[in-house]
Design a protein with these regions (language model features):
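Start-transfer (signal-anchor) and selected internal transmembrane alpha helices
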Residues: 45-72, 138, 160-175, 316-349
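Transmembrane signal-anchor helices characteristic of membrane glycosylation enzymes that use polyprenol
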Residues: 55-83, 181-183, 241, 279-284, ...
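Transmembrane-helix motifs of polytopic, lipid-linked glycan transferases
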Residues: 63, 130-162, 203-210
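Aromatic- and kink-enriched transmembrane "portal" helix at the membrane-lumen/periplasm boundary
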Residues: 74-75, 121-129, 156-170, 174-201, ...
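Extracytoplasmic catalytic/substrate-binding loops of multi-pass membrane glycan-assembly enzymes
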Residues: 77-89, 99-111, 126
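Membrane-interface transmembrane helices that cradle and orient dolichyl/undecaprenyl
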Residues: 164-168, 207-227, 253-263, 325-327
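Short hydrophobic alpha-helices at membrane interfaces in multi-pass membrane enzymes
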Residues: 172-175, 210, 217-235, 264-277
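Membrane-interfacial entry segments at the cytosolic side of transmembrane helices
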Residues: 222-225, 261-273, 305-314, 330-346
Length: 350
């Protein structure tokens, strides 16, 4: 055996650097990386726990405020039809008829669903009023979440941690603001009767809250879905009242301040101009001329070409959907993100 060992090739010892062999250095490198990962997880663990606790209490207090508003409005709502337009809205909703111009088709359909829950015709006005009371309570809920979101963002912008004291300060501010609006005379007056302003206020509060949700997730890959959802809800709100269009300037300013690193007076001026142009585009072009153009095509197809009624408006709707869909797809394929969002938002509004 000694002779055989002498004939075997000699393996040189691996080079040693800093007192460590290559294998040991690799083990120490992995060990260092694992230690860093654990340190980061340990540092972020209290923050994650605090955010989960904040979100839990934010939901609990928010729904408690909603319950206070809902019970208040349901306890004080009009038992029957009240003065002004409420009687007309209740009657047209129950029979799905046409109300006074410019109309409120979405309100009529939602109120019709509410009247179907009435045990008899005597309770039809009560069900419409109850629907408005619940819509007003949801407006208060979204207002509470809006205030708490802004309060939490103020603390985070100042570099301060969300301690228990800060958390309850934010929740208290949201409760005070939401409940103060709950018992205001103007809002309470419209919350217990069958008018369109309660449902319109709910859409307004929902749209603003969703825009703040986008603001919090603006750097994530799929954050634009919030903007598309907002456009869809604004399109629905047109079927209740066009008052919701007044949210557009606020949404534009939130987008500008979130996406701009350096805020200037010129940028603020351009944001004002763009928001005004969007209001004019939706209110003076999309709302009236989309229906008018479809009616003109239908008249041409029926009176000139002798085609069946609604053939022109059907073809117009299909061409509009296909055209906007193809344009949005082409913008997506070419990487035109902003153009794609604009086209999708326009489609949702329509």
């Amino acid at each position: 055996p000694f002779c055989i060992a002498q004939t075997l090739p000699h393996r040189p010892e691996p080079a040693v650097a800093n007192g460590l062999r290559p294998g040991n250095r690799k083990i120490n490198l992995h060990r260092t990386r694992l230690i860093r990962i654990f340190v980061r997880l340990y540092a972020s663990y209290p923050k994650t726990i605090r955010m989960k606790r904040y979100n839990r209490w934010n939901n609990i207090v928010g729904w408690a405020v909603f319950a206070v508003a809902a019970l208040t409005y349901l306890a004080t709502m009009e038992p029957s039809a009240s003065l002004w337009d409420c009687s007309e809205f209740i009657a047209t909703s129950y029979k799905l008829e046409v109300g006074h111009p410019p109309g409120a088709p979405l309100f009529m359909m939602m109120a019709r669903l509410a009247t179907m829950l009435a045990p008899s015709t005597e309770y039809v006005p009560l069900m419409v009023n109850a629907m408005n009371s619940l819509a007003s309570a949801f407006c208060i809920l979204f207002m509470f979440w809006t205030v708490t979101h802004l309060g939490r963002r103020i603390y985070s912008a100042q570099g301060r941690e969300l301690t228990d004291a800060n958390m309850w300060t934010v929740l208290g501010a949201g409760a005070v603001g939401a409940l103060a609006y709950t018992f205001t005379d103007t809002f309470w007056f419209s919350a217990y009767e069958g008018e369109v302003y309660a449902l319109s206020s709910m859409f307004t509060a929902l749209v603003v809250w969703l825009m703040l949700k986008w603001e919090e997730q603006a750097d994530e890959p799929h954050s634009s879905r919030w903007i598309v959802l907002i456009a869809y809800l604004m399109g629905l709100s047109i079927g209740v009242h066009i008052l919701n269009l007044l949210c557009i300037p606020a949404l534009v300013f939130i987008y500008y301040f979130r996406k701009t690193e350096r805020v200037t007076w010129k940028g603020i001026a351009w944001s004002t101009v763009i928001s005004g142009a969007l209001i004019v585009f939706v209110n003076n072009f999309i709302i009236p001329y989309t229906v008018w153009f479809g009616a003109q095509i239908d008249t041409l197809f029926v009176n000139t070409f002798g085609l069946p009624v609604n053939s022109g408006i059907t073809l117009f709707a299909l061409a509009l959907i296909i055209g906007l869909g193809w344009a949005a797809w082409a913008a997506h394929k070419r990487g035109r993100v902003l153009l794609n969002i604009i086209l999708l938002s326009t489609t949702m509004i329509l």
